[in-house]
Every structure is written in C-alpha cells, then in structure tokens.
Design a protein with these regions (language model features):
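Bacterial N-terminal signal peptides
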Residues: 11-21
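Bacterial N-terminal signal peptides that target proteins for export
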Residues: 2-13
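Extracytoplasmic/secretory-pathway segments with low complexity and glycosylation-like composition
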Residues: 27-252
Length: 252
C-alpha cells in the first residue's frame, strides 16, 4: 500500500495512537525512524484536503502546510500507512526559502523550484476509518513535524449530531467511537450490533455536546463481518454501518 507522487499527486488522536500501541505486527521488522510522540516543539504541519476526481472508494488528496522550520537545513517528506511505521520517504532535498516556504530545487534547475505547499499527496487504497500520517524531518531526523488525517472516515450525521468510528486495531477488531452536536447533558442510548450480538447502554453527553469516547470491540463468533453502531438522543438518531475484522482492512 504505497503513495502516489507526481508533479501534481504524491501518493497521512492521541487516544487512538495509544490504543494502537507500539509497533504493530505488520511492521514488527520495520525500523522506527520517526516518532510522532517526539515532534519538535514549534513545528506545525497540517494536511489540507483538496478536491480530486476520485471515486468514493479512493482517498482524497492533501496539500501539506508547514510552519516553524528553520532555514539552512535539508528536509524530507515521509508517510506512515496504517499498520506500519514511518519508513517511506517520498522526497528529499527541501529547504526553507526567504519567504518561509519549503522548496525543492530540481537538479540542473531545468523545471525550476517546486514548492511543497503546491504538491498534492494522496494515499492509495486505504481502509475506512484508518489514520494516515505525514512527516517532515531533517536529514539527521533531529527536527520533525507530523500531521494526521483519516482519509476515508466512518461518519454519519442526523441534524446537528455526528458520530464517527476510528479504526484502532491492526486486525480490524477495535474502533474508537466519538460524537458531537448532541444536547448538552442529555442521556443517549448507545447500541452496538455485530454477529447477532447486541450491546446497549446509556451514556451522558458532556456540557459541550460531546459523546464520551469509547472503544467498540469485536470478537469472531461467525463469518459475518457486518456491524452497526448507533446513538439515539432526544432530537437525533445517528447510525453507522461498517465492516470489521479483515474486511475492515481492505482499501476498497
């Protein structure tokens, strides 16, 4: 599962990262070159979504906005795909110019300079609900910055209410549920269904209208990998249909 890179396209939740925990089985033998928990203070990265001619099964494209990097240092751009460590260097040779932008000077200078904020990065086939990370790092990796997005979110809305699930298991067994837009302090009914099992409980919404975050876990009891998560309040009812297990890991 790589990333596209061309003149136009280069193919990324603290609690979620804690739930993933350490080095996943799929990357057990990959060196840990960059650690998001050790980002350089003052360095800021943001992935800004841009419209692309994609289908619903494809991830969107992003431009990378960077601030706080020093001059006189060479930087590289890295990506981290779900289930792996940072090991894919997309491009190197960026420097901060007099305007504060990262610029890549082509060999020979035939095509002129290329600015990082004009490039578009796009992960290839990617699981729903999984996060994608991009990093900018100095050549010696002492200066680093990170940005995280969920290219294909699992989210549903009803009026002002929204509920989302983030994939936090490399086996597709756990999802982090969160919600917003509910009536402050109201009691809502949270229901999880999969493989004939039903779990139902009451949760209290915060004063800010947020649903308490919780981990939704799954265990194999049949071949059915379809699941449903719903939250019902006084004025809205939000339902999410999704897949879990190996079916959740497919980038389709």
């Amino acid at each position: 599962m790589g990333a596209r890179f061309s003149p136009e396209i280069a193919s990324g939740c603290v609690l979620a990262l804690m739930l993933l925990g350490g080095v996943p089985p799929t990357s057990a033998h990959e060196p840990v070159l960059l650690d998001p928990n050790r980002a350089t203070p003052g360095v800021r990265l943001e992935l800004v979504e841009v419209p692309l001619a994609t289908t619903g099964s494809e991830a969107p494209g992003y431009r990378l906005a960077v601030a706080g990097l020093p001059t006189g240092v060479v930087f590289s751009v890295w990506t981290k795909h779900f289930g792996h460590s940072f090991h894919e260097e997309l491009h190197s040779g960026f420097r901060v110019d007099e305007t504060g932008k990262l610029v890549l000077v082509q060999r020979g200078g035939v095509d002129g300079p290329r600015y990082l904020d004009q490039m578009v990065f796009q992960p290839e086939a990617y699981p729903r609900g999984a996060n994608w990370q991009v990093a900018v790092a100095s050549a010696d990796r002492t200066i680093t910055g990170f940005a995280t997005v969920i290219p294909r979110p699992i989210v549903a809305r009803d009026g002002p209410c929204a509920v989302s699930l983030e994939l936090v298991s490399h086996r597709g067994l756990r999802f982090l549920a969160s919600g917003s837009g509910f009536a402050a302090g109201e009691d809502v009914v949270v229901e999880s269904r999969y493989s004939g099992r039903v779990s139902r409980k009451q949760q209290r919404v915060s004063a800010a209208g947020l649903l308490p975050k919780e981990v939704v876990s799954h265990a194999a009891v049949s071949d059915d990998r379809d699941a449903r998560f719903s939250v019902k309040g006084r004025s809205c009812e939000v339902t999410l249909d999704y897949e879990w297990g190996n079916a959740a890991l497919r980038g389709h």
